[in-house]
């Protein structure tokens, strides 16, 4: 890798495009295997040899019933779990076993979504100038971005950025990065890929760590890809969304409420019961800062692509902001059909929103 440094005025004149980045194509993919949420508690406690934990099983059944999730697509199968029983305990050493699957499945699933986006885009794959890849599933080097470059046959000169362990915020963060790359590199076409495989967090129940049950109920596998660029070529590229601005913020003193740690037992998950309240208490301040420059203060006048961290978050945000029932419909539909897809989730919702818009001719 090499970097050439030029005087500031040269680089601004030569490379920057004065305009907003646009999403030019979207693609999504899921594993063929899927589980029914109503029967999953029976499967989960059977495959983890935990059927004797009757109270725990009933609690898990209640969590699944309240989740408003109908099904989830998963790479893990009963065959895989039977071959690797260390995945079915709570804290047995299993990182190597998980990595063996994740390092191949994450880029493979990412390729499926990327190919769909590239097909919709309709331009030669050689015109992709940048690749931004993110996953919370496993860590490897060379990374999943490198593996995807080979799988797709991208130019060896493609500029790559790999983001690991960014969690649910990563989908929106990848759009922000793609916007910056596209607007600061004239003619750039940025391929963004988010690919998630929840094998990293699957494990048996623990009587001491009950929030583990939430992870087993909530997350699904999937990948999503978008192509971002400026100055779409008339007749050759069709812009779907315009990325006008982006921002990110931290709610102070909340880092202990939502945590994932990569350990010998895999990726552990902790989520406090305060998370929905923390989000709803702060969401309107973020909206005001984002939309005030555009004179927008009616939250029902805009379309919504809200990451569904869980049904409780959607309910509370809707109530707090006085949103009509259709405003978060796409988020609820994606949650129902796929579960929480971590980084890929907002891109699945983005895809659903544009498809519904096209169908309704809006």
From Swiss-Prot:
CDD domains named in the record: CHS_like
SUPFAM superfamilies given in the database record: Thiolase-like
One Pfam family of this chain: Chal_sti_synt_N
Catalytic activity annotation: (E)-4-coumaroyl-CoA + 3 malonyl-CoA + 3 H(+) = 2',4,4',6'-tetrahydroxychalcone + 3 CO2 + 4 CoA
Pathway(s) it belongs to: Secondary metabolite biosynthesis; flavonoid biosynthesis
EC class of the enzyme, as a word: transferase
Biological process per Gene Ontology, one example term: flavonoid biosynthetic process
GO molecular function, one term: naringenin-chalcone synthase activity
Active site: 168
Keyword terms of this UniProt record: Acyltransferase, Flavonoid biosynthesis, Transferase
UniProt EC number: 2.3.1.74
Claim: Acetylation is one of the keywords in the record: no
Function per UniProt: The primary product of this enzyme is 4,2',4',6'-tetrahydroxychalcone (also termed naringenin-chalcone or chalcone) which can under specific conditions spontaneously isomerize into naringenin.
Sequence similarity: Belongs to the thiolase-like superfamily. Chalcone/stilbene synthases family.
Official protein name in the record: Chalcone synthase A
């Amino acid at each position: 890798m090499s970097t050439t440094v030029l005087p500031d005025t040269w680089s601004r004149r030569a490379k920057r495009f004065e305009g907003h980045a646009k999403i030019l194509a979207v693609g999504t993919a899921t594993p063929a295997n899927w589980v029914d949420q109503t029967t999953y508690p029976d499967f989960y406690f059977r495959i983890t040899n935990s059927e004797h934990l009757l109270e725990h099983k009933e609690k898990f059944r209640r969590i699944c019933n309240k989740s408003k999730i109908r099904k989830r697509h998963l790479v893990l199968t009963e065959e895989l779990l039977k071959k690797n029983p260390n995945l079915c305990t709570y804290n047995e050493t299993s990182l190597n076993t998980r990595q063996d699957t994740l390092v191949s499945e994450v880029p493979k699933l990412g390729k499926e979504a990327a190919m769909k986006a590239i097909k919709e885009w309709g331009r030669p794959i050689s015109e992709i100038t940048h690749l931004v890849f993110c996953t919370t599933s496993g860590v490897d080097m060379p990374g999943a971005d490198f593996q995807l470059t080979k799988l797709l046959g991208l130019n060896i000169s493609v500029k790559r950025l790999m983001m690991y362990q960014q969690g649910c915020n990563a989908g929106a963060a990848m759009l922000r990065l793609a916007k910056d790359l596209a607007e600061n590199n004239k003619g750039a076409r940025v391929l963004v890929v988010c690919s998630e495989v929840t094998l990293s967090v699957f494990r048996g129940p623990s009587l001491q760590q009950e929030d583990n049950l939430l992870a087993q109920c909530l997350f699904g596998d999937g990948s999503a890809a978008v192509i971002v660029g400026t100055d779409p070529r008339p007749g050759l590229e069709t812009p779907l969304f315009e990325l006008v601005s982006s921002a990110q913020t931290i709610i102070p003193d909340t880092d202990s409420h939502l945590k994932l740690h990569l350990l010998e037992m895999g990726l552990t998950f902790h989520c406090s019961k305060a998370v929905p309240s923390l989000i709803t208490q702060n969401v309107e301040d973020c909206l005001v800062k984002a939309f005030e420059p555009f004179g927008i203060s009616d939250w029902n006048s805009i379309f919504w692509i809200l990451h569904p961290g869980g049904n409780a978050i959607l309910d509370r945000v809707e109530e707090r902001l006085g949103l009509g029932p259709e405003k978060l419909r796409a988020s609820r539909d994606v949650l129902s059909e796929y579960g929480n897809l971590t980084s890929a989730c907002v891109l699945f919702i983005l895809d659903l929103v544009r498809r519904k818009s096209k169908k309704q001719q809006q």
